[in-house]
């Protein structure tokens, strides 16, 4: 397999993300979204000869792909089926007190998008699912067919930032009266049909934001990310790096504000003359502006175009 190409998923911002971690021999690192193992493999290469990596993912398919790709690194890695929000517990179970770096890549993998049966892609006809862990939780089918019209409107508006959320929710509620909405293409057509003509000729498919909203809601993505930022920071050694690759404004805003909050420390009101909360800064922000893919990467991998990398360092 050519260097930099992966059959499961091509990692985004590969060099930039790994460079941001300042990998060194003997270091301990966590890839909380190990996917096909692309980022993890380079972390292990850069932390040779005795660096260690914990790879986590809720997707069983991803872990199988990562196990195969990382096999040459032998006992220098451990893979665990778990959500990155539970990183502190997983590390405690492994009796690892602190680590030198943490990486999260929040994007849906190419494999998840291309595997029609996972139900992530609006362009491939498949049963509505969208669960990162296909064995747990409610599927997109459950949400689309059982949530009230008001609940659907709130989900689509909050997590998809879709200004036509009301029209879309109404169209879904009307359509499912006749028969359950079962497939991705069926849902995509309903959403597209609910929008005025001017909304159907933009660069992205008219159902993109609705599919994003459902995926985020079903997988608790934003709450898991918030928990990971504030809990996992304490797992870092002083000088350890926390790097996160986000793919849409909701994620990027959460990462930016989370890092800034942990850099500030004090949460007292601005008009208080003396700090009463006792909270001290825990991070130093390294990337004041996020790092984006270069033109060559976007041309080679169009799915990388919206990626943003932010890094902070443990104080």
UniProtKB/Swiss-Prot annotation:
Q: What is its main location?
A: cytoplasm
One of this protein's GO BP terms? rRNA base methylation
Which InterPro entries does this one have? RsmH (IPR002903), SAM-dep_MeTrfase_MraW_recog (IPR023397), SAM-dependent_MTases_sf (IPR029063)
Sorted keywords for this record are: Cytoplasm, Methyltransferase, rRNA processing, S-adenosyl-L-methionine, Transferase
One annotated GO molecular function: rRNA (cytosine-N4-)-methyltransferase activity
- Can you say where in the cell this protein is located? Cytoplasm
Q: What superkingdom heads the lineage? A: Bacteria
Gene3D superfamilies recorded for this chain? Answer: Putative methyltransferase TM0872, insert domain, Vaccinia Virus protein VP39
- Entry's EC annotation: 2.1.1.199
What does the record give as the function of this protein? Specifically methylates the N4 position of cytidine in position 1402 (C1402) of 16S rRNA.
Q: What name does this protein carry?
A: Ribosomal RNA small subunit methyltransferase H
Q: Gene name?
A: rsmH
């Amino acid at each position: 397999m050519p260097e930099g190409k992966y059959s499961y998923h091509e990692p985004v911002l590969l060099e930039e993300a790994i460079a941001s971690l300042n990998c060194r021999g003997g270091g301990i690192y966590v890839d909380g979204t190990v996917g096909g193992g692309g980022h993890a493999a380079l972390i292990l290469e850069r932390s040779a000869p005795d660096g260690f990596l914990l790879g986590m993912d809720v997707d069983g398919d991803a872990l199988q792909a990562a196990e195969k790709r990382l096999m040459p690194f032998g006992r220098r890695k451990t893979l665990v089926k778990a959500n990155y929000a539970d990183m502190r517990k997983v590390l405690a179970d492994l009796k690892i007190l602190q680590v030198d770096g943490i990486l999260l890549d929040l994007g849906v993998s190419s494999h998840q998008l291309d595997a029609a049966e996972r139900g992530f892609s609006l362009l491939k006809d498949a049963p509505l699912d969208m669960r990162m862990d296909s064995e747990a939780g409610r599927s997109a089918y459950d949400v689309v067919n059982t949530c009230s019209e008001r609940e659907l409107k709130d989900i689509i508006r909050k997590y998809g930032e879709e200004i036509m959320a009301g029209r879309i929710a109404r169209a879904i509620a009307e359509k499912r009266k006749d028969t359950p909405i079962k497939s991705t293409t069926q849902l995509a057509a309903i959403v597209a049909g609910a929008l005025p003509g001017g909304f159907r000729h933009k660069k992205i498919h008219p159902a993109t934001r609705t599919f994003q909203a459902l995926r985020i809601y079903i997988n608790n993505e934003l709450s898991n990310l918030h928990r990971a930022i504030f809990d996992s920071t304490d797992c870092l050694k002083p000088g350890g790096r926390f790097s996160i690759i986000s793919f849409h404004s909701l994620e990027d805003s959460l990462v930016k504000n989370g890092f800034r909050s942990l850099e500030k420390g004090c949460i007292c009101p601005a008009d208080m003359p003396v700090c009463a909360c006792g909270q001290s800064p825990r991070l130093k922000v390294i990337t004041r502006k996020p790092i984006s893919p270069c033109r060559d990467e976007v041309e080679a991998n169009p799915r990388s175009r919206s990626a943003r990398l932010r890094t902070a360092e443990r104080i």
